[in-house]
Amino acid sequence: MTLSFRTYQPAADGITPDTARLQQALDDLDAQGGGTLVVESGRYLLGGLRLPSNCCLQLDEGAELIASACYDDFAHTTTLSVAELSDRAFLYARQQRNITLCGKGKITGSADAYFSAQPDEQGYRLPAQHRPRIVVLEDCEQITIQDITIEHAPMWTVHLVSCRQVNVERLTVDNDMTMANTDALNLDSCQDVIVHDCHLSAADDALCIKTTAKPPAMQYKAQRMSVSHCRLRSRSCALKIGTETFADIEDLNVSHCTLYDSNRGIGLISRDGGAFRRICFSDITVECVTAPPCHWGKADPIFISVRYRDPTIEPGVIEQVRFVRITGVSEGAINLHSTPAGYVRDIHFEDITLTQQPGDSTEQGLYDVRPPCNPARPTGMGLDNAYLVNPDTGRAYGVEAYPGGMPALFARGINGLTLHNMTLQRPSPLPVGWNHDAIIELAE
């Protein structure tokens, strides 16, 4: 069955709310057993919408869904999952199946309404405490997201929580690069996922695989995911696994991706008890440049870290990870950190060609193990451990200088590190503050 939204006589002017009409169309589709709802060209101002099973929401070229600038307009799409203090979504479904979002149209998130107009001295635009996520699907299966564009999200853009059989193809996310915590695509405790040919650009993580805290019935492992032929851009980490890791993350394959104009390239960060196993990155190009100090990372092309967040929760190990045919340029170093020692193990690098280049940031020559690092708030989240300044160093807690200067690869507390056919190109003569040793390995 196919329905035309035009038959519901929407205002389509971008000013008059069309929420009730679009929800009615979705409900009518559901009552008929499902099908496709075609949203024709026009600008539709909307609050929260609930998506039913067996639904294809098709946005025609020229169609623009505009998320309301008022958080109260999402009260009826309150989510079970919470991201920071965000418990509402623009497009929402829970325990539904066979949902498709597709078409050449776009979704606009009205992000400016939820952020301060100007960044502070750390480069941080202060967000409102309550901001809607754009797409939140919880405990759903048979999900397809294809061809749509999402712009200017005020919070996490696409958050798939405990979903199975997910296919994301040719998704474009283009968020404001001054707005933190606007992750492009978050795969949270999802299983059997394919992400292919997407372009994801955000100030926060472009693509993040995680296992957040959630009710036990929804707390699955994240496993069996394939990511390929994507272009990723981020002021934080272009392709991140973690930091929220309350369940294991296993069997991931990432290949033929370009990580460009990003602060940190690939990040694996374990904090909350879940282990990482059997992960492979291959045929990836990176370009890492130093971002403003509020963002985690110092232009590291590859970053692996295990450390405690909550002193009562032992962090999970990171093991059986391979990096093969990684090439590119960076202003920082490869960083591998395990605290306690030995929680990062069996890490293999093969056919790596990286060029390290000088930058103009005063932060070059530092490394960053956030979060958490603020001793006054050891279990804190968000701003507590994002960018509070250590009065002893004048830098954010967790941002430290390399012993003896910046190398090309810095490893501390790693067991079973294998380096095969690595080419690390560095300027000659070395800039002031760079270590003459390209590779530094410390026991702890």
Annotate each language-model stretch with its function:
Residues 1-444:
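Extracellular/periplasmic carbohydrate-active domains that bind, remodel
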